[in-house]
């Protein structure tokens, strides 16, 4: 079945924004005498909105609501001025979005980043390649709650059966599962392929071009293909257990060719 609607996560999926996020949260916490934050610390703290990123970057003994609010305000002020300093689209993303648009796929973006920043980044880097962008908005729960993604899907005019939700984190995979959408994990982002698979990814993409075949042909039903595996091997590939074979097959569902 051909897919007609794409909903992408932003940070770690379309944009490598790690450097600017790290610089901004470090500025915010250092201003109040707390230790700087490393790129790796920032990477593992991203995914649940900037308030959570700031909260997790403040030492536990100082982590009061008042201090979180103060540091969050400093983060937003700095990030608003510097969010395009080091941020850039992942290699191949713009080309993939251009191809999706040419093929009639409607594209939306759903982020836990606050709404004004998400919209500014999409406009700057992708322009009209993205139809609608939702960031974090007042009184609407963040991902993985399905409220926002279902609102976005409705506004895009899509339906669940022909929509792929694409992201780089467990939060994204859980969002898709909660909304009843097909979940595609991207292995170039801030989380590992293992985490994505364990969190409910229906298929993995290792590079943006892998997404194109998923939109053209849909995602294979691995449970059905599993029945065809004989001797825990297929083609010239052999595995110690059936689970290992099926795990590898899941990875190939993003356009990787395997002879069977």
Question: Which ranges hold each PLM region?
Answer:
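Helix-loop "lid/cap" segments that line or gate small-molecule binding pockets
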Residues: 28-29, 49-63, 121, 152-153
